[in-house]
Amino acid sequence: MIDFRPFYRQIATSNLSAWLETLPLQLKNWEKNTHGEYAKWAKIVDFLPELTADHLDLKNAVKSDRTLPLSEGERQRIIHHLQQLMPWRKGPYHLYGIHVDCEWRSDFKWQRVLPHLAPLQDRTVLDVGCGSGYHMWRMVGEGAKTVVGIDPTELFLCQFEAVRKLLNNDRRANLIPLGIEEMQPLGVFDTVFSMGVLYHRKSPLDHLTQLKNQLRKGGELVLETLVIDGDENTVLVPADRYAKMKNVYFIPSVACLINWLGKSGFTNIRCVDEAVTTLEEQRKTDWLNNESLIDFLDPQDHSKTIEGYPAPKRAVIIANK
């Protein structure tokens, strides 16, 4: 099973130490209620070797390599274990010559977001809904002191820990399997990311307040979410599914989203990027045993979802507490 004690020791002398009042008990309770597959996935992580990279690049990619290449047997064993953790959603990873080609080219999103961020050097960062942690490693590559990701999905935790073992067992990033609503308000993070989460929330304004409660005064929020065209009063509420997703509740216009942020007490609110999701950014690969974007769009008109709504478009909003 995943051992969280190194993280507890790490934060005990940091500005995250107050979290120790609640987190250990929460994770004990979490372990008692894990999905039946979790034990199998955690064992796969145990089977993976801890490798030390001679060359580690988290600045331009998530890439590890060493001077002495893996033997073909070592390489095939690692591929086998990683494939048992499919589907791999967010990536890509380049690990000792093994290309984990995930469904999402998350490096595309990072390239859109990065130019607009306050420098992450020496920052304490929270990534809400972090998935398997691709962007967390890129944050480390930008010099962040501590990156904490939260995501309740057990498979993502095991994927993250698998990658960590192949990245020098790097402890600058840690994934905690909780949702933002379960976190005590810490109010200490320099930067909080919420990317691809807001539209899954039944109460988006509550989510914005939860994000604000984790930021220090003056800290930076990076919010990336689905949007639609329209004025400050425009919000799409799908009747049933959106792009085959049943858990999509509110898709606002950029102007409406800016209003929500202002109403939630954020300042210096600005939209820094809008981009329609392309078939190059989200697609089927050998590491995804499932449908992808092409299956969610109208086959006759890719400007619409299969349900007839506007196709996915995402905006990046940056604001301060």
Curated annotation (Swiss-Prot):
Q: Can you name this protein? A: tRNA U34 carboxymethyltransferase
Q: Which GO terms describe its biological process?
A: tRNA wobble uridine modification
Q: How does this protein assemble?
A: Homotetramer.
User: What is the uppermost EC class here?
Assistant: transferase
- SUPFAM superfamilies in the cross-refs: S-adenosyl-L-methionine-dependent methyltransferases (SSF53335)
Q: Which GO terms describe its molecular function?
A: methyltransferase activity; transferase activity, transferring alkyl or aryl (other than methyl) groups
E.C. designation(s): 2.5.1.-
Record's keyword terms, sorted: Transferase, tRNA processing
Q: Which reaction does it catalyse?
A: carboxy-S-adenosyl-L-methionine + 5-hydroxyuridine(34) in tRNA = 5-carboxymethoxyuridine(34) in tRNA + S-adenosyl-L-homocysteine + H(+)
Role description = Catalyzes carboxymethyl transfer from carboxy-S-adenosyl-L-methionine (Cx-SAM) to 5-hydroxyuridine (ho5U) to form 5-carboxymethoxyuridine (cmo5U) at position 34 in tRNAs.
